[in-house]
From Swiss-Prot:
Cross-referenced SUPFAM superfamilies: HLH, helix-loop-helix DNA-binding domain (SSF47459)
GO molecular function, one term: transmembrane transporter binding
PTM description: Ubiquitinated in a ASB4-depedent manner, leading to proteasomal degradation. Phosphorylated in vitro by CDK1, PKA and PKC.
A biological process term (GO) from this entry: regulation of transcription by RNA polymerase II
Residues of the bHLH domain: 23-75
Annotated domain remarks: The bHLH domain is essential for its repressor activity towards the CLOCK-BMAL1 heterodimer.
Pfam families, sorted: HLH (PF00010)
Name of the protein this chain belongs to: DNA-binding protein inhibitor ID-2
Quaternary context: Interacts with GATA4 and NKX2-5. Interacts with NR0B2. Interacts with CLOCK and BMAL1. Interacts with IFI204. Interacts with NEDD9/HEF1. Interacts with ASB4; this interaction promotes ID2 proteasomal degradation.
Length: 134
């Protein structure tokens, strides 16, 4: 026997949401199976992209990750041994050498810019800027 409450649910349905058939997207916590399928899709895509992974053989997720790491390291070695890059490394000591900015720095900069942009009054933004921001 199921227990039930005579009190109605407090959740409101917006008329516009109901009439347009718009539903809220679930978070991964709400639907762990969708997260699992999404991760499996990502592993399948990695398997397609990395040339050293045999396509006709079943490989574990761990093997896929190992192949991906090896492939990234191989690409880094190939990039570092490219003649243009090698010539940059052999510059005179007084010259600036090109260095790669860590992604964490770039992500932090983007977050700061996003926060600053959200503080501007909307009337000061041009129509082009509004289209880009929202």
């Amino acid at each position: 026997m199921k227990a039930f409450s005579p009190v109605r649910s407090v959740r409101k349905n917006s008329l516009s949401d109901h009439s347009l058939g718009i539903s809220r997207s679930k978070t991964p916590v709400d639907d762990p199976m969708s997260l699992l399928y999404n991760m499996n899709d990502c592993y399948s895509k990695l398997k397609e992209l990395v040339p050293s992974i045999p396509q006709n053989k079943k490989v574990s997720k761990m093997e896929i990750l190992q192949h991906v790491i090896d492939y990234i390291l191989d690409l880094q070695i190939a990039l570092d041994s490219h003649p243009t890059i090698v010539s940059l490394h052999h510059q005179r000591p007084g010259q600036n050498q090109a260095s790669r900015t860590p992604l964490t720095t770039l992500n932090t900069d983007i977050s700061i810019l996003s926060l600053q942009a959200s503080e501007f009054p909307s009337e000061l933004m041009s129509n082009d800027s509004k289209a880009l921001c929202g």
